[in-house]
Regions:
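Helical "lid/coupling" subdomains associated with nucleotide-phosphate turnover
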Residues: 3, 23, 27-56, 68-78, ...
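N-terminal glycine-rich anion-binding loops that anchor highly charged ligand groups
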Residues: 12-22
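Tryptophan-centered short beta-strand motifs
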Residues: 11-14, 141-144
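Active-site-adjacent helix-turn-beta-strand microarchitecture at beta-sheet edges
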Residues: 127-130
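N-terminal basic/disordered segments at the start of proteins
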Residues: 2-13
Length: 269
């Protein structure tokens, strides 16, 4: 949740940002439904958000749901429970609506966005259930494709395979590259990808902090990214958590997202 202040003098200013991770998608992609336990936790957190908004005297708010709610079989039940127990009405975004808002946020936030997309650029939105890859060339969107390679979906697939952690990267690469190879044949062809813009809840935050070897926060070259991957491969969860200031619980999902990004780098080379 983000709290903003609007005023004629300073325009829009972010004054608070509160985050609580609940992996609703684990239930959606494993069983097709969000469990009562997850709904209870979600409602509890949303009630706390409502209390925070009251403290700030918030006059209006918007709450959105994406693939974890959109793809569950009990969407209407979940939305009704949230409304009754928290007073919050969730607006469930379609895939295209979600991507449109993501692109707007990138364009508004990145001062160099227009300059970047003059060259071959892929915007990759990594969600829980799928990823959206959009190709820009000479300042124009030339192709966009949704692939069912979301982080939580891949995690559930690894769980079903009952694979050892040492085998995760190899299995992920096989799964990811089988779909990306089709995408490459259909859309890349002779195009060159010079830049990849990542939108996710996992690796992006680390890039903003500045990865090993990166000279500028928010940017990383392929060589520095390979160094980051080597750290992820060779260090324990505790060591990685201490190095990057993250929780150990988030590392499995960060690793899956990191392998996805590495595969995208490889097909663009």
């Amino acid at each position: 949740m983000k709290i903003f202040e609007f005023s004629p003098k300073i325009g829009i200013r972010e004054i608070d940002h509160i985050r609580h991770r609940i992996d609703l998608g684990n239930d959606t992609f494993a069983t097709g439904k969000i469990s009562y336990e997850k709904v209870d936790e979600l409602c509890r957190v949303l009630r706390e958000f409502v209390d925070i908004m009251r403290g700030y005297k918030v006059e209006d708010f918007k709450a959105y749901g994406t693939s974890a709610i959109r793809e569950t079989e009990n969407t209407m039940i979940v939305l009704d429970q949230i409304r009754q127990r928290t007073g919050i009405r969730i607006e469930v975004l379609s895939n295209s609506e979600q991507r449109f808002l993501d692109y707007k946020s990138i364009a508004l936030k990145g001062q160099d966005f227009n300059k970047i997309i003059e060259k071959g650029t892929a915007i990759v939105d990594i969600g829980g259930g799928s990823i959206q890859v959009s190709l820009f060339d000479k300042d124009t969107l030339v192709a966009t494709q949704n692939l069912r390679l979301g982080v939580l979906r891949l995690q559930e697939l690894l769980n079903k395979l009952n694979a050892k952690p040492s085998k995760y990267e190899g299995l992920l690469e096989e799964i990811i590259e089988s779909q990306l190879s089709v995408f490459k044949r259909m859309y890349l062809k002779d195009r060159t990808i010079d830049n990849i813009i990542i939108v996710d809840d996992y690796v992006s935050a680390l890039i903003q902090k500045r990865l090993t070897g990166s000279q500028t926060p928010g940017y990383v070259d392929s060589a520095s990214y390979e160094m980051f991957m080597q750290i992820m491969r060779t260090h324990t969860k505790e060591e990685i958590a201490a190095r990057f200031g993250i929780s150990t619980e988030s590392i499995p999902l960060i690793f899956i997202s990191a392998v996805l990004i590495l595969s995208l780098i490889h097909i663009s080379e």
